UniProtKB/Swiss-Prot annotation:
Transmembrane segments: none annotated. The keyword Endoplasmic reticulum does not apply. PANTHER family: 60S RIBOSOMAL PROTEIN L12, LARGE RIBOSOMAL SUBUNIT PROTEIN UL11M. The keyword Ribonucleoprotein applies. It comes from Helicobacter pylori (strain G27). GO terms for cellular component: cytosolic large ribosomal subunit. SUPFAM superfamilies: Ribosomal L11/L12e N-terminal domain, Ribosomal protein L11, C-terminal domain. GO terms for molecular function: large ribosomal subunit rRNA binding; structural constituent of ribosome. This is Large ribosomal subunit protein uL11. Keywords: Methylation, Ribonucleoprotein, Ribosomal protein, RNA-binding, rRNA-binding. Part of the ribosomal stalk of the 50S ribosomal subunit. Interacts with L10 and the large rRNA to form the base of the stalk. L10 forms an elongated spine to which L12 dimers bind in a sequential fashion forming a multimeric L10(L12)X complex. It holds the Pfam family Ribosomal_L11_N. CDD domains: Ribosomal_L11. The gene is rplK.
């Protein structure tokens, strides 16, 4: 018989840097999950993913065991890395802070394809370009 799911927790944790301090500790502690066991497993799985924030979905079962799924880094983090900026523009309509090429947009869309709710590359590129536009990053040829 399958284990009974008692909760699902969604977090964004820096790759390879999960520790029991907030937000990880309190989120897992209130569900009764072994926090250090999760931290070790997460850090092991994400140690080669650079310094990105990694979205993770943790499924907690009735017997206090858990499974987790890691996703690709957020599109905004990938855009910031590709364009070399620290954060998005405070006024994206007036202040363009960086430029991305269509090739860079395609690389980001390719990387995020499995996490996006689309099946075509064109739609994925539009999603990435929309995120870039809202950050004040201009897409050029």
């Amino acid at each position: 018989m399958a284990k009974k799911v008692v909760g699902e927790i969604k977090l964004q944790i820096p790759a390879g840097k999960a520790n029991p301090s907030p937000p990880v500790g309190p989120a897992l502690g209130q569900r009764g999950v072994n926090i250090m066991e999760f931290c070790k497993a997460f850090n092991e799985r994400t140690k080669d993913m650079g310094s990105f924030n990694i979205p993770v979905i943790i499924t907690v079962y009735q017997d206090k065991s858990f499974t987790f799924i890691t996703k690709k880094p957020p599109v905004t983090d990938l855009i910031k890395k590709a364009s070399g900026v620290e954060k998005g523009s405070d006024n994206p309509l007036k202040n363009k802070i960086a430029k991305l090429t269509h090739k860079q947009v395609e690389e980001i869309a390719q990387l995020k394809m499995e996490d996006l709710n689309t099946s075509t590359m064109e739609a994925a590129k539009k999603i990435v370009m929309g995120s870039a536009r809202s950050m004040g990053v201009e897409v050029v040829d």
